[in-house]
Amino acid sequence: VKADSGSITYDGQELLGKPINKILEAGIAQSPEGRRVFANLTVLENLKIGAYLRKDKDGIEKDLKWVYELFPRLEERSWQLAGTLSGGEQQMLAVGRALMSRPKLMMLDEPSLGLAPLVVQDIFSIIREINRQGVTVLLVEQNANMALKIADLAYVLETGTITMSGTGAELLADSRVKEAYLGKSS
C-alpha cells in the first residue's frame, strides 16, 4: 500500500519511497506476517539470503552461529527445504533470516499467528533475547497479553489511531486494556 501522506523517518533519515536495499542499509529488517519463507530453498539458503547485502564473511558466519543458538532446530534442519518445515519452524526461519541482515531495528508482524501455545512462548522468549542483544524490536501483535509482558513501551491502536500508550506493565494493569483486549473485567 502506497502512502498518500505523512513521512517515515528513522535515525534522522527519510525512508518513504526509498528502495528496499537502502532501508536494509539503514539497519531495518522485517519479518512479515505469514512467515513467507522461500519454500524451495533450504533453511541455510534462506538464512544466507538475509545477509545478501553484507560483504563481511566472518560476520555472516558469526551471525549464522548466533541464529542457530537462538533457534537450534534450524541448525538441525539446515539442509531441509523450508517449505517442509512446521509453521513454528518457518516462523523461526523468517525471524532468523531478518536477523542475518544484522539490523538495528527489527519489525515483527504477528509472529505468533497460527502457532501452538508452546511455540508462541518460545518465539516471545527469543524476541526478548534479541532485544537484550541490542536490537530494537517493533512488534505488531494481536496476542496483547504476551506482547505487553515483553514490551518496554506499548501503544494501543484503534482504527489507525494511537489511543493509549505506556510501558507494557502499565497497559497490562490498565482496566480498559484488560476489558477490551485481555478478556478480563476490572
Regions found by a protein language model. Name each.
Residues 1-186:
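Glycine-rich phosphate-binding loops of nucleotide-dependent enzymes
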